Amino acid sequence: MCIRDRECIEQLEEINVIPDIVLCCCGGGGLIAGISTAIKTKFDNAKIYSVEPEYFDDTKISLEKNKIVSNSMKHKSICDALLAEKPGNITFNINKINLTSGVSVSDDEALIAMNTAFKHFKIVLEPGGAVALAAAISEKVKIKNKNILVIASGGNVDKNIFKNCLKTETI
């Protein structure tokens, strides 16, 4: 956790950017716990948001209720890497300190973000890895005139899902 997250800070320092807002995908909460801990040590004023698939926003709801809440698991999502039933105990205790709140995005918003990443940056993202970008594109948080750090991770995407994303709109 420490090496990867320290690299994030070093890259921000290298380009001399102070993030106002950080958007990061969230399943069980491990990635965002590490990222948020690193960000908060250097950029204490940054607002950090977990981004989850619609109907699988257990971290968002858990943060709102200040206790771990489980998803019903009766819905489906293409964001298969993020379909945790509930936040991890250790990661939730870290995230409730570091995170501003959570947001959720639809599968369609994730597909648009995947297409946008591919068309504009030539990056192939899996649906779960595209949710943070989806949150920025769909303005789930106010980002105008802010420095936004979007954590886009994972390129393990089913070829049929990727073909579908290429048929969606893009920004």
Segment roles from a protein language model:
Residues 1:
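Nucleotide/phosphate-binding catalytic cleft detector across ATP-hydrolyzing
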Residues 4-97, 143-144, 148-171:
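Glycine-rich phosphate/pyrophosphate-binding loop at beta-loop-alpha junctions
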Residues 4-6, 88-145:
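Active-site-adjacent helical/loop segments in soluble small-molecule enzymes
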